[in-house]
A protein has these predicted regions:
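Short, solvent-exposed secondary-structure boundary motifs
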Residues: 40-41, 47-51, 94-96, 105
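A membrane-cytosol interface segment of integral membrane proteins
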Residues: 109-155
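Helix N-terminus capping/helix-initiation residues
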Residues: 11, 33-34, 69, 85
Length: 155
């Protein structure tokens, strides 16, 4: 049962900024050939857009696990999540960040959710995950834990 799902698509400004590859490639290739410049500009921009879309991770919460990108955390090993926005999110991604944490963060998405990992065998003390809906993600994890009848396992 899927309780939450979000794909971390790039923001519009990322696609606009990526479009700067067009004048850059035109500047390089127009002196050689206008056709080569135009074709190269289009191909490079299309490649950048395709890469941004293809590498957009999915955040998902089911009754059994939390998935962030390629990583999976059984719901029984997920601690009580904390949602952070604005300045607090910036601090979590910066000054308060533990180098051992599992990160699925995107620069174009400010809010984050910190999910403690209670598995003693896991080297990551917590996951830090970007999300546009931090309260909904945290609530979905709490609901999944409640539905599973699990309490946070401690190390």
């Amino acid at each position: 049962m899927q309780l939450y799902r979000e794909r971390l698509w790039p923001s519009v400004w990322v696609f606009v900024a990526t479009a700067l590859v067009i004048p850059a490639s035109l500047l390089v290739f127009l002196p050689i050939s206008p056709t080569a410049g135009q074709v190269t500009a289009i191909v490079l921009y299309a490649g950048c857009v395709a890469a941004l879309i293809a590498t957009s991770p999915v955040i998902e919460v089911t009754g059994a696990e939390v998935t962030a990108g390629r990583a999976r955390l059984p719901i029984g090993y997920a601690g009580v999540p904390e949602a952070f926005e604005k300045e607090q999110a910036t601090l979590e991604r910066g000054q308060r960040l533990d180098a051992r944490a599992w990160l699925v963060i995107r620069g174009w998405i400010s809010p984050v959710v910190k999910i403690p990992v209670t598995d003693a065998a896991d080297p990551a003390p917590y996951w830090l995950v970007s999300t546009r809906r931090p309260a909904a993600l945290a609530a979905a994890i709490v609901q999944a834990k409640s539905d599973a009848g699990s309490t946070p396992r401690s190390a």
